[in-house]
A protein has these predicted regions:
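Basic, polyanion-binding surface patches
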Residues: 1-212
Length: 212
């Protein structure tokens, strides 16, 4: 039997993306998001208008989409409630966000030079996609609170072990992306780590960690 619970959150499960971009002073920003999907060589990204990443993409017109594996959940969670913006709205403060100018160090991840864009890649991520912004659209009703970005993938870097030998394809059995479902982290179909984001958003469930 179906019910109509009036769902407040519609995050049914998408891969976590670490977006690296450049701040106005040339330093790197790093932000985890899960509002992303791909079609052909393009990707659609959903970002809140109060995010430093949104400001950076509108100004610079480029970024890198870094896809972490499920084993990188610790690094992702370290920056889950951080922002590159010194000033933040009250609702973010109440959720526990803090300003962090050096996200790479906080996440304990390494900057790696890109080939075609100025923003760095995340060396530890098995998949890295250098992108340019094609368009940006207001998103979220009559008073948009977010921006939908269309980006073109200029170059994709993939760990050699993940590529099916002799082909241009990723091995789906070898690739275990970090998935976010309803603000919780999953990999291989299991909850893999407690989520700071779920705590900040007061999600009404507590899942048991089965970290590998």
């Amino acid at each position: 039997m179906h019910v109509v619970p009036g769902l407040k959150v519609l995050y049914f499960g998408t891969p976590v993306v670490l977006i690296s971009s450049l701040n106005e002073d040339g330093t790197a920003n790093l932000a985890p998001i899960s509002s992303a999907w791909w079609l052909g060589q393009s990707c659609m990204l959903g970002l809140g208008n109060n995010a430093q990443t949104t400001v950076n993409l509108l100004r610079e017109g480029e970024c890198v989409l870094n896809l972490p594996s499920s084993t990188m959940v610790d690094a992702v969670d370290r920056i889950a409630l951080t922002t590159g913006k010194p000033a933040m709205p009250d609702y973010k403060k109440k959720q526990g966000y803090r300003h962090e100018p050096d996200k790479f160090s906080t996440a304990q991840l390494t900057e790696q030079a890109s080939d075609l864009v100025r923003a760095p890649r995340v060396a530890e991520c098995p998949v890295q996609m250098e992108c340019r912004v094609v368009s940006a659209h207001p998103f979220g009703g009559p008073e948009p609170h977010a921006t939908a970005f269309e980006v073109e993938v200029l170059r994709a870097h993939v760990e050699e072990d993940l590529v099916i030998p002799g082909t241009h394809y990723v091995d789906p059995l070898g690739w275990d992306p970090l998935i976010m479902k309803f603000c919780e982290f999953f990999g291989g179909g299991r909850n893999v780590h407690p989520s700071r984001l779920a705590e900040g958003w007061n999600m009404p469930h507590q899942l048991q960690s089965t970290t590998v």
